[in-house]
Amino acid sequence: MVLALEGLNVCPTTVRNVWIKENLETKYKRLLRLEAQVFKDGLELTVEQIKLLEKANPEFAERHVESNYPGYLLCQDTFYVGRLKGVGRLYLQAVVDTYGSYAFAKLYTSKRQETAADILNDMVLPHYQAHDINIEAILTDNGTEYRGRPMIHLYEIFLELNDIEHRTTRVATPRTNGFVERFTRTILDEFFRTAFRKKLYESVDALQADLDEWLKNYNTERPHRGYRNQGRSPIETFEMGKIRRNEMLKEAA
């Protein structure tokens, strides 16, 4: 449109060939390139561009969220997977580190405070303890599995015992947890839909085993092109963040 106003006509095929040459043949790739320019060059966006980026990548909506290093702020959410024959309803507890998108995921047959705490105890804390990192804060919505009466609610007690600050999203605005929203969208598209087409699962354990394999690839092999990772895998960003964390803690000492 702009070129036409200037009296220039460009063949759509020419535009397409340029996109292919620059690895920008899809709208998603073009948005990723735009996102990278924002953080690399300080590019100012129009309102429409911001809306498109936030729709393509919910994490972008959280671009002003401070996350200085691994463990600084994690996000947790419950995702309804569906029904498994002979088992019933399946729920996924998902936890994502906002510094680099390192993620954890575990399946349950219920949506309760016990399961919300279990993934932290079983998967999340052991990982950070192995790296000698403290989890400083976790962000959740206001679901009953996460919020309740102090000193009675199991999840709240678990966080208190482990000296983890509990932050919550604004009431009636569940989309303010963009990091975990992006992860659950990815796990639905790249794992669950494919897994259920290829295989008939008869137990939660069987599905969890395949999920663990997918998650290993997600964290260690899959490049993340979002603004925080810039093409690195979550574990690569995590390891780089450990160095940054140590430097920041030394400066603060």
Please tell me what each predicted stretch does:
Residues 21, 32-38, 69, 111, ...:
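Intrinsically disordered, low-complexity segments enriched in polar/charged small residues
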Residues 23-24, 33-40, 49-51, 99, ...:
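Short, intrinsically disordered/low-complexity patches at protein termini
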Residues 50-51, 58, 63, 162-164, ...:
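C-terminal domain-tail junction helix/linker
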